[in-house]
Design a protein with these regions (language model features):
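Activation targets extended, charge/polar-rich intrinsically disordered C-terminal tails
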Residues: 17-23, 127-185
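Sec-dependent signal peptide recognition
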Residues: 2-9
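A structural motif
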Residues: 93, 101-120
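Extracytoplasmic/secreted envelope proteins and their assembly/folding machinery
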Residues: 38-42, 58, 108-112, 138, ...
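Short, surface-exposed secondary-structure edge patches
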Residues: 29-37
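Sec-exported extracytoplasmic/periplasmic mature domains
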Residues: 49, 116-120, 142-150
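Hydrophobic h-region of N-terminal signal peptides that target proteins for export
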Residues: 9-17
């Protein structure tokens, strides 16, 4: 148990040490006027929240309709599809949104197909980011892009992203090549 606590503390402090300090985080509950800017496939990443251990690493979800996110938020919940307004309602959270530069109509159709195929899984931290047996928030988001790009033989997607990592943290998604930050202000 002592080693598990030490491991969690080390992961907590190292999981996002290389994040660009200039990244423009937007207060989550103030971007109501940005809802029209979201598109299917946009990745939403919430900042870390130190008071809640479930949020120590941040949180990630993906837009699955123009007004709804899809996510695996916590143990016992499985897949949840929720209104983005409700998802952003937390007062003390900040958000960054990312968009894949090559998200065209063909990619979108296959992406939504993969969303539907991966809805009925259980939440579980897995050390195989390529597995679709279980999902956790950021691995689910990454896996959707990985699977869709693989299905379409997309040469623009970095299949070797975090190649040697067993876990994809929410903040890791901020480093995905060919994704741009969406201005939410």
């Amino acid at each position: 148990m002592k080693y598990l606590k030490l491991l969690l503390i080390l992961l907590f402090f190292s999981s996002c040490s290389n994040i660009d300090k200039k990244l423009n985080w937007t207060q989550a509950n103030t971007i109501v006027e940005s809802f029209g800017k979201f598109q299917i496939g946009d990745i939403l990443i919430k900042n870390k929240e130190f008071i809640d251990p479930r949020s120590w690493f941040g949180h990630a979800a993906v837009m699955v309709t123009p007004w709804e996110i899809g996510e695996y938020p916590m143990i016992g919940a499985g897949y949840i599809q929720a209104n983005v307004y409700d998802w952003l309602a937390e007062k003390n959270r900040k958000v960054v949104a990312l968009r894949y530069n090559y998200f065209n109509e063909e990619f979108k159709n296959r992406f939504l197909y993969n969303v539907n195929r991966s809805k009925n899984k259980n939440y579980r931290i897995t050390f195989d980011k390529y597995s679709d047996k279980y999902f956790y928030c950021s691995q689910y988001v990454w896996y959707l892009y990985y699977k869709t790009a693989k299905d379409l033989n997309d040469k623009n997607f970095d299949f070797n992203f975090k190649k040697d990592s067993l876990i994809i943290f929410p903040y890791d998604l901020l480093k995905l090549p060919n994704f741009e930050v969406i201005n939410l202000e």
